[in-house]
Design a protein with these regions (language model features):
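Ordered alpha/beta subdomains of enzyme catalytic regions
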Residues: 1-181
Length: 181
């Protein structure tokens, strides 16, 4: 679980993207697509970890470390301090962050293939869309947090799948039952 402002878990260069989107843009759709496998000799990825990511980061993490904290006294100074020490504060976007803080929830819809599904590399597994027009910027902002969390759980799930294939193979060779594996 994160234990600090979740907005600091983002790619810092994305902090200024909101100002770069075309005026009048009201909807953003972004996809999480595995681009490669961390395992040799595989061209598939097991979709796994999204439900835990949503609960741990997007619900619990944002509630405890963003929405439930004082914006002016805690969130904004911390955010400015970290950005000021890295890429500068010109992209802080106080008004949009305050608007999100005052809203009290993440205005996002997340659609995905079922967990446990194996897909080919380069096949989108997750779709994220904003539900309120003024939060277009939020969609791509959480991508870093999502991808940093998902790759590890997906590699673990794929390793588990491979172990299961080995166990099934030898169970079929050595067991006297009619169980489909």
């Amino acid at each position: 679980m994160i234990n600090y402002n979740p907005l600091l878990c983002l790619d810092f260069y994305k902090t200024c993207h909101a100002e770069q989107y075309p005026k009048g843009l009201t909807r953003m759709v972004s996809y999480y697509t595995p681009r490669m496998s961390r395992l040799a000799d595989t061209d598939k990825v097991t979709m796994f970890g999204l439900q835990a990511f949503i609960k741990e980061y997007l619900i619990d993490g944002f509630n405890k470390y963003f929405f439930e904290r004082d914006f002016e006294k805690e969130i904004l100074p911390e955010y400015k301090r970290v950005l000021g020490a890295t890429i500068g504060t010109s992209g802080v976007g106080k008004e949009r962050l305050l608007k999100l803080h005052n809203l009290g929830f993440l205005p996002l819809i997340i659609n995905a293939i079922p967990e446990g599904t194996r897909t080919n590399i380069h096949v989108p597994q997750i779709e994220i869309t904003n539900t309120l027009p003024s939060f277009v910027w939020l969609v791509n902002s959480i991508e870093t947090m999502l991808s940093c969390t998902m790759w590890h759980t997906q590699v673990s799930a794929e390793v588990g799948y491979r172990y299961r294939q080995i166990v099934n193979k030898y169970a079929d060779l050595t067991c006297d039952d009619d169980v489909d594996r």
